[in-house]
Amino acid sequence: MHRENYFSKIAFCLLGVLFLSCITSVQTVSGDAASHEERMNNYRKRVGRLFMEQKAAQPDAVKLPSGLVFQRIARGSGKRAPAIDDKCEVHYTGRLRDGTVFDSSRERGKPTTFRPNEVIKGWTEALQLMREGDRWRLFIPYDLAYGVTGGGGMIPPYSPLEFDVELISIKDGGKGRTAEEVDEILRKAEEDREDM
């Protein structure tokens, strides 16, 4: 009888040790996964920062205080920029930093209509500085794009994005800044670049 109790206690202790070792293994594996994800995100941040620095260093690039970088491809003749709630008709192509196209109204063959307050922060800022007919190449840091979560399955976390954006029209003419006000803001941003 004592012998059965003795072996039962030993078996119970061995099961306990086995159980604890399994829990420790699971914690180590999940810790490794979290550590891997953290390393990947740190890598994405570094690469994204370098991408933005390279784009900002190009001779025709303008960097705004927010970190948004743009290049003018074509200058329009519109008299105003859109206000945050003006409906805008645009053509665009969106790319990841490696050049992969993730969305394009041009490929669909039809412009898109939306308000500046309905899109990512980088677009919101840029559109309010564009006039009808302007076409810009935008380089948007991750914090003005889809942030730490990424977007739509195609855009990883911490991804800077590149967009080729053409503002075709502003419905009802626009209520935003005048062309002169926009030119003054952009002139100041260009002067700040030259001072660096």
From Swiss-Prot:
One Pfam family from the record: FKBP_C
Cleaved signal peptide residues: 1-29
Cross-referenced PROSITE patterns: FKBP_PPIASE
Keywords: Isomerase, Rotamase, Secreted, Signal, Virulence
Keyword Isomerase among record annotations: yes
Compartments where located: Secreted, Extracellular space
Family: Belongs to the FKBP-type PPIase family.
Name recorded for this polypeptide: Macrophage infectivity potentiator
Organism: Trypanosoma cruzi
Organismal lineage: Eukaryota, Discoba, Euglenozoa, Kinetoplastea, Metakinetoplastina
